[in-house]
């Protein structure tokens, strides 16, 4: 490890430290830090939110003077414990080492391990024209020609992602399947269905089931649901983080984890003849913010909008005006963050991608109109304004010749656009086959027995948390589904009460389209299908993000689905065993009463 001095305070500055929170900036680097003093004890950290790198300021609501608030998303950090308190029970802040030197100066130190990509370094060799070519297919899918090898990133080329919420914005080149079949290896960054697309992989597996696919060794396996998917792939390789994987004498790659979501998200460095290509994909803080500088090509997401917040929320502050202003502000923050990241890393070329999706199903017209995305050209213009980085806004089928661009960025053959008349944007989507799969779950025998509710949430395994959730099945327009289920779950003791308990408790209402929620329940899928796919409408009181709850249902559900076969056998043996739910609505907001009769 190397030790880096981040900040040095003089004896006078040390003597003037006040009890509680102290903010400092290193004027030479422009970096900000927080020191917390409790009598003789000092703790310190970077003034950077772990979520998306926002700056902390004093939390005026904290009378004890121990917490700071992020200016981006209002996350709160208790600096006395270095634990985040909003969202509750979520992350811990990385602490810095505090030392006094022989001159009574206070030093803030960071211990840095060596960068794994610097091990066994290679000097860049000159590339022949056409030797390295990067072709954009759609969304996050790139086709890389690296000498005599071909590598593909994140192939989502047909069908929806996140149940039925996302559809491709760009029309993939007509030869996309041939390109996949010709690949020597495929990298899939994480398990979200706009990167791990089973409809796409099913097409590929029909012709090349043994194609080598590489994924990182995440806590939640990328292919956790492979057996249930029915897709026959026989050559999936799970590789450790931070270690070069040699493909041939000229080509190697290294997978790195995300600093915010290490349990599921990854990014990749591909190196050919010493030239690095960095693809940070969807990582919030790729590799904890430590990334190679001056790579040949960097690509990352840019668009925003990959969340149900705030479009799917209502009640309280969530007016249309508030949502519109929030979305506008957040998109601008994301643009500035990406531009700053590119400026700091100084790649020769930057490409915004992994944000080209659209909410094209007619039932999601509101989301499509509300959930505005960043314009890649606006980001590229911002980057060019502040740096000498070359930018590339890709179009389906466009090819970047890395050798040409590195030698002469003005070379007219450096980027070959698709032929004139090529269809760029999709104007039709084959909805029906995918909606039929979802609709098949609605009439499944499981849901004739309302005891499925207890069975499912017991299987899910989330409990001992003070939260009450009301789950309501709805139609396309989020009106109550005729004959659908409407019930309470108390996660403190995992009970299903008739009405909300009298104790103080946070409360959420989750309205879910019946086809998607039943498909998710039946197959034991993660709730990203619901939340990121815009298939819910939510209300919460108080307005707090319950990280433990959402993180569990979005990433920590069991790896195998509920045993519904056994469940149905028990139902047959025990008679109806059905909990009958009826809803008596009161005039009190969020105080809906339930009549529950156990007929077992």
From Swiss-Prot:
Q: Which InterPro entries match?
A: CMP-Neu5Ac_hydroxylase_Rieske, Cnh, RibonucZ/Hydroxyglut_hydro, Rieske_2Fe-2S, Rieske_2Fe-2S_sf
**A Gene Ontology molecular-function term?**
CMP-N-acetylneuraminate monooxygenase activity
Residue intervals of the Rieske domain: 9-107
According to the UniProt record, what class of enzyme is this?
oxidoreductase
Keyword Metal-binding listed? The answer is yes
Q: In which pathway does it act?
A: Amino-sugar metabolism; N-acetylneuraminate metabolism
Its Enzyme Commission number(s) read 1.14.18.2
Pfam families linked: Lactamase_B_3, Rieske
Q: Which reaction does it catalyse?
A: CMP-N-acetyl-beta-neuraminate + 2 Fe(II)-[cytochrome b5] + O2 + 2 H(+) = CMP-N-glycoloyl-beta-neuraminate + 2 Fe(III)-[cytochrome b5] + H2O
Where does it live in the cell?
A: Cytoplasm
Q: Where does [2Fe-2S] cluster bind?
A: 49, 51, 70, 73
Cofactor(s) recorded for this entry are:
[2Fe-2S] cluster
Q: Which PROSITE patterns match?
A: RIESKE
Cofactor, how bound (note): Binds 1 [2Fe-2S] cluster per subunit.
Q: Which PANTHER family match?
A: CYTIDINE MONOPHOSPHATE-N-ACETYLNEURAMINIC ACID HYDROXYLASE, INACTIVE CYTIDINE MONOPHOSPHATE-N-ACETYLNEURAMINIC ACID HYDROXYLASE
- Reported function: Sialic acids are components of carbohydrate chains of glycoconjugates and are involved in cell-cell recognition and cell-pathogen interactions. Catalyzes the conversion of CMP-N-acetylneuraminic acid (CMP-Neu5Ac) into its hydroxylated derivative CMP-N-glycolylneuraminic acid (CMP-Neu5Gc), a sialic acid abundantly expressed at the surface of many cells.
**Family under the similarity heading:** Belongs to the CMP-Neu5Ac hydroxylase family.
- State what protein this is by name: Cytidine monophosphate-N-acetylneuraminic acid hydroxylase
Please give the organism. Answer: Pan paniscus (Pygmy chimpanzee)
